[in-house]
Amino acid sequence: MFNFNASRWTRAQAMKVNKFDLTTSMPEIGTDFPIMRDDLWLWDTWPLRDINGNPVSFKGWNVIFSLVADRNIPWNDRHSHARIGYFYSKDGKSWVYGGHLLQESANTRTAEWSGGTIMAPGSRNQVETFFTSTLFDKNGVREAVAAVTKGRIYADSEGVWFKGFDQSTDLFQADGLFYQNYAENNLWNFRDPHVFINPEDGETYALFEANVATVRGEDDIGEDEIGPVPANTVVPKDANLCSASIGIARCLSPDRTEWELLPPLLTAFGVNDQMERPHVIFQNGLTYLFTISHDSTYADGLTGSDGLYGFVSENGIFGPYEPLNGSGLVLGGPASQPTEAYAHYIMNNGLVESFINEIIDPKSGKVIAGGSLAPTVRVELQGHETFATEVFDYGYIPASYAWPVWPFPDRRK
């Protein structure tokens, strides 16, 4: 059906999702959760890291980045107002807000959506943030382009600050050939660039969320997308409206500003419509591909968890991939609070951070918006299986090592 041969997350595999398995469940978050900032919503979050995925500290400071918006904006309207903010901390959990990372002139569109921030390899303090430059109009997202903005990080005994980040460079966007674009579907998804070096070939790549390039609703779901399901299983007709994929691009320039799109690594046609924030861990000869998704974005006839999903390859980044734990679910909301957390990001050290999304008050039934960081959970990767084993403080995101730089404080001007 498609002009490429990607691994498939099938309906049969997704049917195995077990919302009651404690080895793949977040701890329950109560209604009295702590709020990091009473003037800001924050959601998708990522650490300052090296290009190999390891969180790093800079001159004694841990640094994270989050999508932020003013709390006077309604919770469900925050996406069109998203900016990238940064926080710093000595202990990896007592976060101080430093402000917006990008200057007003940097983004040529209306919102800044997720990506990742790396220390430029071989540099002392050069930082590169890959993000989604997003344009909203009255109908929603009109443009979504992977972009990069660059600057430098500085620190002293009082905190962290940045300079630069006053312009950005567009890198790649949906082509309508491998990845669905606006013309094919005005509800398309294309975002969340994650840049890394593939240890197998030493090349630099970027993962991203996308949809399969097909006019929405025009293609039928095939046996390869359905998989081995029980006899008489009915696939609803509208299941073909869901066409999530995890895409990959190859870097063509040493400054990481020129890229070429490659066919997707994984598709979920007829299974789910969103596989957001893809990222990768290389461990014990295996390649672990992670993403996040919602129960609400599953195709008709399927149900799942809001949370972290994962797939494993024994043959490197290009697969083939099989879903972890048989279903793909790695860490979802508990059955009592299925929407409590989202935007899970697993780091090389096995720690998974996320944000508090929506808590259901057990007394009133009302939904309480979170907009703050959730408890961090350790997940152990054991071959084709995973196990949630330990719970840490809210927003605990420690560095794995210190970026190699002279420890002397920088001078403020």
Curated annotation (Swiss-Prot):
Residues the record marks as site: Transition state stabilizer: D192
Major site of localization recorded for this protein: secreted
Q: Which GO terms describe its cellular component?
A: extracellular region
Q: What is its EC number?
A: 3.2.1.26
Q: Which GO biological process categories is it annotated with?
A: carbohydrate utilization
Question: Listed GO molecular functions?
Answer: beta-fructofuranosidase activity; levansucrase activity
State the protein's name.
Answer: Extracellular sucrase
What species was this sequence derived from?
Answer: Zymomonas mobilis subsp. mobilis (strain ATCC 10988 / DSM 424 / LMG 404 / NCIMB 8938 / NRRL B-806 / ZM1)
